[in-house]
Amino acid sequence: MTDFVQLIGIEKHFGGIAALKSVDFTVKSGEVHALIGENGAGKSTLMGVLSGNVIPTAGTISVEGCVRRFSTPGDAIAAGIAMIHQELVLAPDLTVAENIFMNRMPRLIDWAKLRRDAAQILDRLGFEIDPGATIGDLPLAQRQIVEIAKALSLNARLIIFDEPTAVLGPSDARRLLNLIRSLRSEGVAIVYISHRLDEVADIADRVTVLNDGSLIATRAAKDVTIEEMVRLMVGRPISALFGEKRTSPFGAEIFRVESLTAGPLVQDLSFGVRAGEIVGLGGLIGSGRTETARAIFGADKRESGRIFIDGSQVKIRDPRDAVKAGIGLVPEDRRGQGVVIDASIRINTTMTSLRRFSPAGIIKRTFERRFVGEKIAALKVKSAGIDAPVQSLSGGNQQKVVIGKWVDVASKVIILDEPTRGVDVGAKSEIYAIIRRLADEGRAVLLISSDHQELFGLCDRVLVMGRGRIRSELLPGEFDEERLLSASLAIEPIQTTVRTDQNPAG
């Protein structure tokens, strides 16, 4: 394979800050080259240079051996380079065909030909999508395919994928990865950016690691393990990310649900969590884990079942009742449900606890600002200040704000649904430390995650769900990915009780 693109000695300075420090990066035709690193490592800036969105301070760009200068994205597109952004750039009110050929349609449009041309590109990708469908009516996975079709319509010979599977379920993610393999076999060069290192190991031919704007290493993917990728990214092994598990005994059971039923995906569930215990909910997508969390929190209506806090039954009809009972929920969709994305860090952090700052109905701003400042410092939120909008933060820092608003409100129980989805390895480590601290303070923690390493690394027990029921309960000595997957596909449910013989110190 020959080099399609060479970036040599790329530097980029923003004011006095060096975002890229003499980085070399090459991509060959017909290869998938993964680019990994923590948030702030320089990945976005480097790809901004390659896609024409960022003009480098120094360095050269060569395409097929010819030195090029990219001043605009149009320059990169003309050279055969396109980028699929994590936040898709599509017009929701236009059709699939119109989006694919946007800004390139003649004044007199032959609509039938436009749809035929769009269908031809979509057929090449192996997806049946109606060219006349409105983008806003399509599921996210199909919109992503339209974005790829748009890149191919531009005769792109190098496509940059930025976190392409971050919001996709396992099935759609597999289809997308297979599509990328197909593009590779056609000779298309691929740059693949992802925090999902298992995908990187699965699909990449080469891996480049950036840290603090510097090139750390470029390796053949077959020669580097996920453990080594993490060590190169953050300077420590993956096992160190989870911290030390509890060694002291758990407290009494402070949270219990009995015979909880809420639709087909929550069927007759009974389980408990002790003070200081982190209990995982594992299973496949669609097994009922998120629905269980929402039913407990009062976000979805329950058909039957009882909830107990400290041995006393509590009535939870809506999230307000849950908060009063000392239960907090960090939702799966942090941008859509966890934060007000356009509001400030201050507003988001205090929205669940305004009463503590307004005893007479008037908010004490000085007290509020001091509280928020201390909170974001404790959570290590990296920001321009408490009045910065949440949307200006990285995914990991947004998630810390979501967790932060529940830290004081969720005095008894905190439920975390996919708390590290879409965040980098360094931010994951900090979120894990927060979760451990919540447990060490005596809260009952219920952790939902599709990341099996996360479940096994953090949890004291894992309840495995499948088709709305608890299928198995795994203790640390039983933590095994094959066992978890087998249990999630099992037919017979179990009724779990807290295993009093299982204790860190016992």
Curated annotation (Swiss-Prot):
GO terms for cellular component: plasma membrane. GO terms for molecular function: ABC-type D-ribose transporter activity; ATP binding; ATP hydrolysis activity. ATP binds at G37, E38, N39, G40, A41, G42, K43, S44. Its EC number is 7.5.2.7. It is found in: Cell inner membrane. Keywords: ATP-binding, Cell inner membrane, Cell membrane, Membrane, Nucleotide-binding, Repeat, Sugar transport, Translocase, Transport. Part of the ABC transporter complex RbsABC involved in ribose import. Responsible for energy coupling to the transport system. This is Ribose import ATP-binding protein RbsA.
